[in-house]
Amino acid sequence: YYAMCTWFDETCGQLIDLLEKRNLRDDTIIVYVTDNGWSQNPERNGYAPRSKQTPYEGGIRTPIMFSWPNGDLKNGKRKDVVSSIDLFPTVLAATGARVPDGLPGLNLMDSLKEQKPVKRKGIFGETFAHDVTDVENPEASLVFRWTIEGKWKLLLTYDGEVNRYKSTHPRTEKRPQLFNLLKDPKEEKNLAKDNPEVVARLAAKIGKWWPVKERKVLTKWE
């Protein structure tokens, strides 16, 4: 794992050196994004639980970094909730192109240049059994869906087929999981039982975002 981190750092350096050698660095936007989190398991050569392939913060909360010397971006670390769906409208805005209406992502340029808060009410995501097994019917391997809105994160568990990834997705808790990410970033205390109105509201938003038809899910604490 650490060797891969070192290799990645070296190859990024080689790319930046090439851009500088060709006098392209100042006008080039570099965006770092990764597909999943990986918390190293100190006891073995692999990732820790609630990390890679899971819907918990250790698996989905990853950094996105922008670098653009001539773009007048403000240096700093932000904690806004953003997504890879924001990359397309952001790069369009950087080039001066018109950002079409109706895109699912947000243009982050104002935030990057002026450190304005990202105007996002909530964000949604889903997890499958490693990958979507059937692109014509993505529900077949749907395992989790979630939404993050403010301090709240609601995680719903579905009955999609996991096949050989059963050990990765044991789904021991099939009831809704609600976490206060500000107080409990490691998602150790499920607050769903004590906050049914929050669960109902966020579950309805998940259903509106992507209305699934075949999968079974519990949206109430039973």
Where do the language-model regions lie?
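Soluble non-cytosolic domains of exported or imported proteins
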Residues: 2, 6-9, 78-82, 102, ...
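Active-site-proximal N-terminal segment of extracellular/periplasmic enzymes that hydrolyze or transfer
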Residues: 189-197
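Feature captures the catalytic ectodomains and active-site-proximal regions of enzymes
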Residues: 6, 20, 60, 88-89
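A long, amphipathic alpha-helix that forms part
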Residues: 1-28, 71, 94
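C-terminal cap/loop subdomain of S1 sulfatases and analogous C-terminal strand-loop tails that border
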Residues: 38-44, 50, 80, 85-88, ...
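Intrinsically disordered, low-complexity polar regions and short flexible loop motifs
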Residues: 184
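Histidine-centered active-site microenvironments of extracellular/periplasmic hydrolases
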Residues: 18-73, 82-83, 133
